[in-house]
Amino acid sequence: RCSIGDYRFTEDYVKLFYKHPRGMVGVDSSMVDDRVEGVYPPWGRPGPNTYSAYPSFLNRYVKEQRLLTLEEAVRKCTALPAEAYNLEGRGTIEVGSYADILLIDWENLRMNSTPRETRRYPTGFVYVFVNGVAVIEKDRHTGARPGRVLRRKPDPTSSI
């Protein structure tokens, strides 16, 4: 097993990682309240990946560089992490799975954050369903919070 942060390595190395059949996308972030300004910089604002990691990945490696197909990229963001962490019923759309679904307006998928203002939500995520409940409708949060902490099931064949 291996992990990589795209801020630590050269772009060529990152591309090699993402092209590998087992290379997957993950986000190391924290929970933030977007209505509150922190007191001491740089902790006052979260990093840009807190709001825009996945649109950034999709735009950069699928749209712009054509490193991956959309299908490959989606798998690296969904099914592969669910498999790696043994999250049953997650990462695929099939009978018996949780209804976690994202509908993207591909032409209008954009990061809206800037280095000075990182707390801007992306556009182009038209609908997001978590456990079958709409949490985003037409790029706006519905107020619903059906998510929960996911705990991996032990995998007897894993070394971690």
Label for each model-derived stretch:
Residues 1-160:
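Active-site microenvironment of metallo-dependent hydrolases
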